[in-house]
Amino acid sequence: MAISFQLLPELPVGVKHGVGGIIGQKLYAGLGSSGNAFFVLDLKDMNSGWKSAADFPGIARNDAAYTVCGNKLYVFSGAGIEGNNSFPTVLMDGYVFDSQINQWKRLERTLPTGFLGASCCSLSPTEIIFFGGYDKDTFNNFLSEISKIDVTKEPNKYKELITIFMSQPIDNYNWNKNVWSFTPCNEHWSVVGENPFKPNCGSGIIHKNNVVTLIEGEVKPGLRSLETKRYLFKEGKLEYSDSSASIIDICKNHEGLAGHFFGEIDNKIIVIGGAYFIGSQDAFIKGNLYAHNGLIKHFSSNVWIFDGKSWENKCQLDAAGIAYGVSASNGKAMYVLGGENSNGDAMTRCLSLLMD
């Protein structure tokens, strides 16, 4: 089965660590590195290119959890600078974008926990499910302390604080272990299960029928998970979960991925790009909790396909890797919108992917 890529019109500005999705025949992308900007591309009129949609009304943010549900785009949490702060904190608000009227609305209820870096998906047109997310207090306290240090005047103190924070065991970061459910019609939040695996941030997430597949992500800052997990939901509750076939089964030097693009085409899960540190898994096995210390972040260009039984490295996107962009798919095509390259640049390139 061949994979074909098609270049789409470029975004007006680069978008990394942002949000977006596909609603009907329109693609949306924005926030993250583009601030409060939000853009729309009509797939039936691509010659017109991306146009400005309604600006996001809340605090500009990176790495929010986002998904399309009931033909609306929902955005939760993320990290942004509130009030008079000089550093980002975990945001506890949510917003919904109504594409029919091109309008954002803030959700009335405060989030039950921080969802910075969390993964979420629509389990049905009336329910959104959440996995993972940074702990608000842990994140905020660390950013508060490190913001007090002038790295040019006190580089050793800065490095020491980073080292102490990164050298903690996985459980010390207290990432969200609960599987949360959100009902948009009444903004009701509930815990529908506890994740039996180590919680992740920056995972790929795909929903099909009553099964949610969670693909890798981080287990702590700088260290990736090597697992693909499946979660079966029944009557709104987490019924069963297990480990699935993983990329490391066919690629023994695989380091795991975070910030990868993901989608579903013809009942196959597609994973593209992502970032990781070469040597981090070996360092962690040897007892180095600061597993990515001194290592260079690598940006992948691999295209992986999962048929539910095994993974296959089908091809490469190009010579350069990419991560931290917006993923969207509709079962027939997958879209790779923006992202970040190995130089840290926010990308404007957009692609569609088809399987022939």
UniProtKB/Swiss-Prot annotation:
<dbReference type="InterPro" id="IPR015915">
    <property type="entry name" value="Kelch-typ_b-propeller"/>
</dbReference>
<keyword id="KW-0880">Kelch repeat</keyword>
<dbReference type="InterPro" id="IPR056734">
    <property type="entry name" value="NANM"/>
</dbReference>
<feature type="repeat" description="Kelch 2">
    <location>
        <begin position="163"/>
        <end position="210"/>
    </location>
</feature>
<feature type="repeat" description="Kelch 4">
    <location>
        <begin position="333"/>
        <end position="355"/>
    </location>
</feature>
<dbReference type="Pfam" id="PF24996">
    <property type="entry name" value="NANM"/>
</dbReference>
<keyword id="KW-0677">Repeat</keyword>
<feature type="repeat" description="Kelch 3">
    <location>
        <begin position="288"/>
        <end position="331"/>
    </location>
</feature>
<protein>
    <recommendedName>
        <fullName>Kelch domain-containing protein VC_1773</fullName>
    </recommendedName>
</protein>
<feature type="repeat" description="Kelch 1">
    <location>
        <begin position="72"/>
        <end position="125"/>
    </location>
</feature>
<dbReference type="InterPro" id="IPR019936">
    <property type="entry name" value="NanM_proteobact"/>
</dbReference>
